[in-house]
UniProtKB/Swiss-Prot annotation:
Disulfide bonds join 52-68, 149-215, 180-196, 205-230. This is Serine protease ami. SMART domains: Tryp_SPc. One of its GO terms (cellular component) is extracellular space. Residues 22-26 form a propeptide. GO terms for biological process: proteolysis. InterPro entries: Peptidase_S1_PA, Peptidase_S1_PA_chymotrypsin, Peptidase_S1A, Trypsin_dom, TRYPSIN_HIS, TRYPSIN_SER. Residues 1-21 form the signal peptide. It is an enzyme of class 3 (hydrolase). Its EC number is 3.4.21.-. Keywords: Disulfide bond, Glycoprotein, Hydrolase, Protease, Secreted, Serine protease, Signal, Zymogen. Belongs to the peptidase S1 family. PANTHER family: COMPLEMENT FACTOR D, KALLIKREIN-RELATED.
Length: 265
């Protein structure tokens, strides 16, 4: 009898361990993307290593998250576009140096407010079936809770730190701000400029930060960073809405263009 109970205890321990080791990455529960399906996706890299996601919004501009910035006057970042695989050769894959990093001036790394970053590329990219900008939300439209939107990235897939070589994508439901601000969720930390999305064991994670949340073919928000256990139903993914920052985006792009191409006296 004692042996039987010992065996049962071992089985229970192994079962719990197996459950805890299931993937919990941000793009947890996702699937491989396909070539040319997400031509707006960008991999922001430092020394050839993927750091964050991003979204191509113009032929010389990528939108990402402010916590992905290097905080250096001379950017050491590169952006990979036209890729599904981070390592394998692909027909339209290109790597472009970042000329300028423009984090939102009010970004607060402690509370993650205004977590947006504009990256000006060193050259205009040649558009192709695998490299194409995505329009972003510029109208103040409240998207209904429960709507399923797409998030993609090369972020962490397991708590062990495993990251994919192939772009992962996942449809996640939006969660109302009222629910996300409940005490057992984020306890009133979600501002009017943020939105939550995700469900149990379906989420985005470390390395997906900066990538877009896409609803009806439009980038509506950007994946935030944060210290949380990915895939936790009461700690869903937090995203920075793009629409409240449309003026900052357009003005920053315009001013940077003027600096790069000053008018003759």
């Amino acid at each position: 009898m004692n042996v039987s109970w010992a065996l049962l205890a071992v089985v229970l321990v192994l079962t719990v361990a197996t459950y805890e080791c299931r993937p919990r990455g941000r793009i947890l529960g996702g699937q491989d993307s396909k070539a040319e399906v997400r031509p707006y996706m960008a991999s922001i890299q430092q020394n050839g290593i993927h750091q964050c996601g991003g979204v191509l919004i113009a032929d010389k501009w990528v939108l990402s998250a402010a916590h992905c910035a290097t905080n250096s006057s001379n950017s050491s970042l590169n952006v990979m576009l036209g890729a599904i695989s981070l390592s394998k050769p692909e027909k339209y894959k290109i790597v472009v140096k970042v000329l300028r990093e423009i984090p939102h001036p009010l970004y607060n790394s402690t509370i993650k407010h205004h977590d947006l970053l504009l990256l000006e590329l060193s050259e205009k990219v040649t558009l192709s079936p695998a490299v194409n900008p995505l329009p972003f939300q510029n109208e103040n439209i409240d998207i209904s809770a429960g709507k399923r939107c797409l998030v993609a990235g090369w972020g962490q897939m397991r708590l062990t730190g495993k990251k994919p070589d192939t772009l992962q994508e996942l449809w996640v439901p939006l969660i109302s701000r009222d629910v996300c601000n409940r005490r057992n969720y984020y306890d009133n930390e979600i501002t009017a400029n943020m939105i939550c999305a995700g469900e149990s064991r379906k989420d985005s994670c470390e390395g997906d930060s900066g990538g877009p949340l896409v609803c009806d073919g439009i980038a509506v928000a950007i994946v935030q960073g944060g210290f949380r256990k990915c895939g936790n139903p009461t700690k869903p993914g937090i995203y920075t809405l793009i629409e409240p920052y449309k003026s900052w985006i357009m003005e920053s792009m315009y001013n940077a263009t003027l600096q790069s191409n000053p008018s003759p006296l």
